[in-house]
Structures are given as C-alpha cells and as structure tokens.
Amino acid sequence: MNETVANNKETRGFQSEVKQLLHLMIHSLYSNKEIFLRELISNASDAADKLRFQALSNPALYENDAELGVKLSFNEEHNTLTISDNGIGMSREEVISHLGTIAKSGTAEFFSKLSQEQSKDSQLIGQFGVGFYSAFIVADAVTVRTRAAGLSADQAVLWHSAGEGEYTVEDITKESRGTDIILHMREDGKEFLNEWRLRDVIGKYSDHIGIPVSIQTRVRDEEGKETEEVKWEQINKAQALWTRNKSDISDEEYQEFYKHVSHDFADPLLWSHNRVEGKNDYTSLLYIPSKAPWDMMNRDHKSGLKLYVQRVFIMDDAEQFMPSYLRFVRGLIDSNDLPLNVSREILQDNKVTQSLRGACTKRVLTMLERLAKNDTDKYQTFWKEFGLVMKEGPAEDYANREKVASLLRFASTEVDSAEQTVSLESYVERMKEGQDKIYYLTADSYAAAKNSPHLEQFKAKGLEVILMFDRIDEWLMNYLTEFDGKQFQSITKAGLDLSQFEDEQEKEKQKETEQEFQSVVERTKSYLGDRVKEVRTTFKLANTPAVVVTDDFEMGTQMAKLLAAAGQAVPEVKYIFEINPNHTLVKQMADETDEEAFGRWVEVLLGQAMLAERGSMEDPSQFLTAINSLLTKG
C-alpha cells in the first residue's frame, strides 16, 4: 500500500444521527452480521461505476489503471480484514461528508420510527441503507485510506474511528487511486478471517456485481498443499446480472441483486426482467419490494431507477423513468439509445426517456395485474404496503387511468371488514339490474363510514356502496370519475337519485308526504336563514331524523378537511339540510306550535346531522343548550 502519514490531523465528532445509527445497527443487525460484506462490496462497485462515468469525459482519471475491481485480504495475526477498490476514491471533504454525517432527508423521521424491537428495527435500518457503517457490526475499529481519482498522491486521506463519538482524519500519501477499508475485527467477527467463509459470503451476496471481486489466496503445489506464494483469485462471475439470459438466472440471484440495488434486507415481492429490441433498445429489471420504504409518503425524497447507458452506470434515482405513484419500484434501466453524457436536464425532455417511461410504467402495471389475477393473497400484501400511493395514480397518469383504477382496492358494504379487498371490477359485476352508477361514501374512518346514516336506504334496497376512509380518497374521486363506462356517484351529494329502484306507488306516497311537509320545510328554512343552502325532505333515511349533504358541485366535507389539514384556505361549505318526515323526532318537531321550541328542535336535528357528517360543529354550546331545554321540557 506504501502510504506514509503526512499531517493536518484533526479529531471530529460524529453527527448525532450517526451515533444513533451505529448503536442501533450493532445491536439490531447482530444476527445478520455477514451483510457488512455485501454493503462494503456494493459501495466499492458503486465507486467503480462512478469512475467509469467521470472517465467518459476525462479518461486521464484512469491513471493507466482501467481494470476496475474489488480485492479482499485478511491477516489473522493482526486481526484485520481489508476491502480495497480502485474506483473513484474520496477527497478530504468527501470523507468528512460521507463518513461523518448522514446526508439524507427525513433522518429525524427515520429515527422516530425505530421501535427498539430488534426484528422491526433491522428491517427499517435495512431500508434506510446502512452502507459503510455496517463495518462496525463486526469491527471495533475501522481505518479508511483513500485517494480521489485525479488528485496527487500526497492528497490522500486517512480516516479512523472506533465507532463511538469521534473519528480522526488526516492527510497521507497514497500512490494508488481508490479506497482501502481496514476492519479491526471484534472477537465475534473473527469468523470472517477465513478464506472459505469469505468465498461463501461473496458467492451468496456479490456474484452479480459487474466488476471482479477477488480474494488473496495461497498458491498450491502439485500435491495440493499451500505454499508461501500468494495470488489474487476472482470469486464472482463479474457479469452484470441484467445482461445475462433470464433462463440462466436463479430466483436467489434476482433476490440478491435486488438487495444490492435497493439496500433492502427483505426479498422483493416480484420482479420483471425484459430485453427489448426495436425502435428503442433497452433492458429493464424492475422490482416490487415486499415492504414499503419508511419514507415512501415523503414526495420530496429522491427515488427512481438506476440508469445505465450501454452498460455504463450514469446515475442513481433517475425518477424520469417512473411516475411518482410508482416511486416504490426499484431496479434499473440500461438504454442503448441515450447519449453517454446524458444529464438529468437532458432526460427531462428527451423523447427516448418518454418512450422508456411509458414502457416501464406499463410493465409494472401489467406485473401487478397478473399478480392481482393469479395470487389474491399476495396482491393484498402489496396493497397494504403500497395502496395509498397507488391511489395517486388516476390523477397523475391519465393514459393508464383505467388500468390503475382496476388495481385499486376498497372496503364496501358487501364485506363486513375494514380490509380493502374489493376491486371496482368485482363491484361492477355485482351491480343490481337497472343500476348505472358506482355508489361510494367518503368518511374519516371505517367505523364512521360503516355507520353513516347515508347508507340506510342503500341497505334497504340491497345496493352495494364502496366505503372510502383514507385521507386521499376524496381527492382521488376528483379524478376518478368513471370505470368501465359507469359514473361514480357520492351518496352524500344532493343529486343522488334512487327513483329507478322505487315502484310507482311508493313514489306517489312520497310526493304526497312532501307536499304535506312543505310548511315544516319553510319554517325550518326561515329559522336557519343562510346557515344552510337549502332545506328539504328526504326519503333516503330509515332510522335517522336528518342529514346534511352538499350540492353536486360543492366541495365535499372530506376534501375540505384534507385542505384544512394541509394548511390551505378552505371556502365555507354550505350544506343542504334534509329532514326525514317519517321519523318520530321530525314529526314531534312538526307538531310544535311554539316557535322558540321549534327552533330548539331544529338546532338539535341540525347539530346531530353536522356531527354525523363532520365529526364536529361550529357552536357546540348552542347545540347543548337546545338539548338541555328539550330534555327539561320533557
């Protein structure tokens, strides 16, 4: 290695999040400690990718050493394991930035989700991406020697830490480009100071790495005995997995490659590997994770596919190839048609990019369609993890709106459960004769939806209603207006018409009752004034005296709540007050001749209706006064 210590040594403190991560990782990932090798080899592979990319415009960065690879050696006497690469390397500033801090958005949120429960924590830490810090699972101290490509030998850096509160960084001289990571192994990490143990782990985790991973081994004589001479022996295939034939790749290899590109610990739910030739030549390898990333709902978090051009790594998190509602998809795309000097800005308006985005989107949706059709249980697993972001699809992807809609799942009155298992396709298949609309109800919770008074008439007529209680649902329904030629109809809107399910005798009776109650409606409207938009009778209720509904083109209650929660200005919602003339309480109100007492009845019935609809009211004290007055009178 021929490094000599120079000067400018300083001791620095770790960022507080690094301390937390180190502590949690050492304790939570102890049972799966061999993953440190996967992480460090994966980092070395990334360093080689980055050098290749930068050398496209500056070949001198290779420094006459273009054969990139990773080398592992160990020294039992000194109790060290060394992982060396001749990739891009790091400058002093980069060492401090990458090895002393966690430069990720949402770090505080990540730590708040940790439960101190080992199995759950290890899963979350895996999703977060432990990378370099995984070295401390098996080492009680780590030394890093590195020189960035393009810098002189005396601009190399030595970093050292015992994994506690501090680390040191100093200038050294290092002739070779790249990074050496020297692990000073713990007692329980010494199992990795063994050639066959290392071979086993490399074969398990790193066979798919696109550069050679070699191990230092002793040369054997003709009799098979070890000599003092050592050599480097390549352990892995060193062929990029996605360039191989699908028939030659095992499920285990696909699963390990997923863990390499995603830094996830769990196996993926499913994947799709495709090579396309024609107008656009490209290979895609797309994975659906089995668990949602911890920061999936943070739309600002960078996500996307790895982009390669002609097998040369270009960038991570290329979000241009996948719509935002599929931001959980992991994997890569390798294009033969994009220029090697492509940038994020060029990708933005590139026709090839648009074509690849469309193809990858269809590929993922087709994968999910097959899963939904062939394995209902597995699809439900997917929906529980990713259903919320899938509901962003109809607004974002007009071209695939019907396809996305067919993948959505909801609760409904047909199934007595909060589980979202009902597809729109199955709802349409069960529609009653004469039914031309898909009925739905939005609410704050499943319990609120299930017990909504708006459902009473639908239950009586045997009409299924989709129950929506995710915060995003009301917003979703602004964009999802029809499915399979059937319009959606909110059952809390004033324009709801169920007359096609009523006989002529029933209609005639309702008309008579409506006329008889006209004076009660007018008295109620006179009392309420402009507090409501309108007062009218309704025959949609059975056990409830009154409800409030919104006009067809008025903002709904749940949408108003969504905007308010987001801190946006919300226009006042003017409700239509509907009273049930067949209910005992409404009849009592109608019989009341004293206008002051009549007003108290109106306050109670309107208050009840507002509570059922909104879960709150503007003036609870007025409502309570009216109730107390009526109870006292009784």
Swiss-Prot record:
Record's signal peptide: none
Record-linked InterPro entries: HATPase_C_sf, Heat_shock_protein_90_CS, HSP90_C, Hsp90_fam, Hsp90_N, Ribosomal_Su5_D2-typ_SF
Chain residue ranges for the region called C: 562-634
Chain spans, region B: 345-561
Statement: the UniProt record of this protein carries the keyword ATP-binding: yes
Annotated localization: Cytoplasm
Any Pfam family hit: HSP90
Protein name in UniProt: Chaperone protein HtpG
Organism per entry: Vibrio vulnificus (strain CMCP6)
